[in-house]
Structure formats: C-alpha cells, structure tokens
C-alpha cells in the first residue's frame, strides 16, 4: 500500500511531536519532514514532495501565507495538498490562503483523529480507514464535547484571555462552533458573530469588538 507522505510545520515543538507520533501510527501515512518555521519548511519542500502539507498560519521568519506564496513560485510538479492550522479565523486571511492554494482549514485546538481523516480526504485516499474506525469513533462521541471544552479552556488560558471578560465567553463559543462547522471560517462576520450575538442577546458588532 502506498503511504500518504505528510510534512508538518508549526512553531509549537510539543504539538509537532504529538502530531508526528500520532500520524506515524497510521497504517497509511508517514511523516517525511517536520519544520518549526517557514524557512525550514521551504528548505524541506525543495528536496521532498509530500502529498499533504500541514501548515500553521502564524510562525516566525515566514508565516504560513508567505510559505504558500513562495511555494507557488517554486512551481513544483507535485504541488502538495495544504491543510492550514489556525488559532483564529479571519475572513481576509482565509480568502488569501485559499487563493494561494490552501485546501482546508482546521481551527486549533483540534482532534487528531479529525486531522488524519482530513489528510486522507484531501489526498484522495479511499475512506476504508475512516469506515474501519467508525465504530470506535461512535463509542467516543459522547466524551468528545467534554474533551473539546477542556481543550478550548486550555488554549484560551494559554493565550492569556482573562476568564472574567465577555470576550472570553464569545471566544469559547466561536471556537466550539467552528470546530463543529469549519465552513463558518468563511462567514465570520456574516454568520458566526451574528449567531453568537443571538445566543447572548447582544449585537454582532459587540461580539466582534469583545473578541478582538
């Protein structure tokens, strides 16, 4: 069986280590390179041809968008399928990344099983592996919301958002909603903020100001 070749790029070394271990455990995948900034990523891509590039947007030296721009200029014969990782969704950034060739967006924090399934999808592999694990996925489905809430709380604390401000509640809700429906990243001001505003009986503009 031909394995999906994956390259991982993120300045969070701990996350890269976890992803590398998890992906390497998949029967149909192999990690052929890891990088911690945009320059290292481009160096790897000069010599290697991953099927899927998992790329963080915010990184030192060169960010994810700059990497996409330079990757396009390289005119590689085998252009990788790019999955972007992002902590915050902004419509202008999302649109620019798509224009530069990004195939999919995943909002941090994310479920690793969800990521590997998307790696299979963008690489065009069959869904047999997804079907094989469907029963185990169903058995864990009830526990996911609690794990998701814990992950969201952890990441918000890490970026230093105080729990007592309103933006904290709105941000938690936004992350949870986008986790369940990634397409909301393309309609942040038109759908996401208004939906949060309805839930908290406020206006979309106030939600946006509080989050920013």
From Swiss-Prot:
GO terms for cellular component: cytoplasm. Phosphorylated by KinA and KinB. Its main location: cytoplasm. It is found in: Cytoplasm. PROSITE patterns: RESPONSE_REGULATORY (PS50110). Pfam families: Response_reg, Spo0A_C. Residues 194-212 bind DNA. Residues 5-123 form the Response regulatory domain. This is Stage 0 sporulation protein A.
């Amino acid at each position: 069986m031909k394995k999906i070749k994956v390259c991982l790029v993120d300045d969070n070394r701990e996350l890269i280590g976890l992803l590398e271990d998890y992906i390497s455990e998949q029967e149909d995948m192999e990690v052929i390179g890891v990088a911690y900034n945009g320059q290292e990523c481009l160096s790897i891509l000069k010599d290697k041809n991953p099927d899927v590039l998992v790329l963080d947007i915010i990184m030192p030296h060169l960010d994810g968008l700059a990497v996409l721009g330079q990757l396009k200029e390289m005119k590689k014969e085998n252009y990788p399928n790019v999955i972007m990782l992002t902590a915050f969704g902004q419509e202008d950034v999302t649109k620019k990344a798509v224009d530069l060739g990004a195939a999919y967006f995943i909002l941090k924090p994310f479920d690793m099983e969800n990521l590997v399934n998307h790696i299979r999808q963008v690489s065009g592999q069959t869904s047999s592996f997804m079907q094989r694990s469907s029963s185990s996925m169903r058995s864990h489905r009830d526990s996911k919301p609690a794990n998701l809430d814990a992950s969201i709380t952890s990441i918000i604390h890490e970026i230093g958002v105080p729990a007592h401000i309103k933006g904290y509640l709105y941000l938690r809700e936004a992350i949870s909603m986008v986790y369940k429906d990634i397409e909301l990243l393309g309609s942040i001001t038109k759908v996401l903020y208004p939906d949060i505003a309805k839930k908290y009986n406020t206006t979309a503009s106030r939600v946006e100001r509080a989050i920013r």
